[in-house]
Amino acid sequence: MKVLEERNAFLSDYEVLKFLTDLEKKHLWDQKSLAALKKSRSKGKQNRPYNHPELQGITRNVVNYLSINKNFINQEDEGEERESSGAKDAEKSGISKMSDESFAELMTKLNSFKLFKAEKLQIVNQLPANMVHLYSIVEECDARFDEKTIEEMLEIISGYA
């Protein structure tokens, strides 16, 4: 086996998540398809999806990891019941809520700033919510950008988080 082009391009978490969710749907590994498959098996139909349990498990784990909001902190008491819609939505990552159009729009807006490709990739993957987080991603942020520009960047990013 010969490597033709080494590290031709980077993939964002959104692109990986989209590919893997499409793979789940294609091979009937998503929750809706699995429920429908169980129901059809009970009726006697034998629809066999692509059977590769290791790939299915890895795909499910990666999709679950990418769908979780890493910045979410559960601040509820143990005895309280949480609201299913509001809490579940807060636990989802920003990239799991994005569409192709919103992802392209975010990238277009980030292209208006003088950021390196790796910095844009990190911003899209992490969707920083505060200045400290953005400073950890953007190299020499205080020297390259003034405070107004940084606030503008954070405002744009918060619209997609």
Curated annotation (Swiss-Prot):
Region (Disordered): 75-96
Signal peptide region: none
Biased composition (Basic and acidic residues): 82-96
GO cellular-component term (any): cytosol
Domain of life: Eukaryota
Pfam families xref list: RNA_pol_Rpb4 (PF03874)
A biological process from GO: tRNA transcription by RNA polymerase III
Gene3D superfamilies: 1.20.1250.40, 6.10.140.870
Main location, first listed in the record: nucleus
Complexes and interactors: Component of the RNA polymerase III (Pol III) complex consisting of 17 subunits. Forms a Pol III subcomplex with RPC25/RPC8. Interacts with BURF1/TDS4.
Similarity comment text for this entry: Belongs to the eukaryotic RPC9 RNA polymerase subunit family.
Free-text function comment from the UniProt entry: DNA-dependent RNA polymerase catalyzes the transcription of DNA into RNA using the four ribonucleoside triphosphates as substrates. Specific peripheric component of RNA polymerase III which synthesizes small RNAs, such as 5S rRNA and tRNAs. The RPC25/RPC8-RPC17/RPC9 subcomplex may bind Pol III transcripts emerging from the adjacent exit pore during elongation.
Extra information: Present with 2930 molecules/cell in log phase SD medium.
Protein name: DNA-directed RNA polymerase III subunit RPC9
Annotated source species: Saccharomyces cerevisiae (strain ATCC 204508 / S288c) (Baker's yeast)
Phylogenetic classification of the source organism: Eukaryota, Fungi, Dikarya, Ascomycota, Saccharomycotina
Gene name for this UniProt entry: RPC17
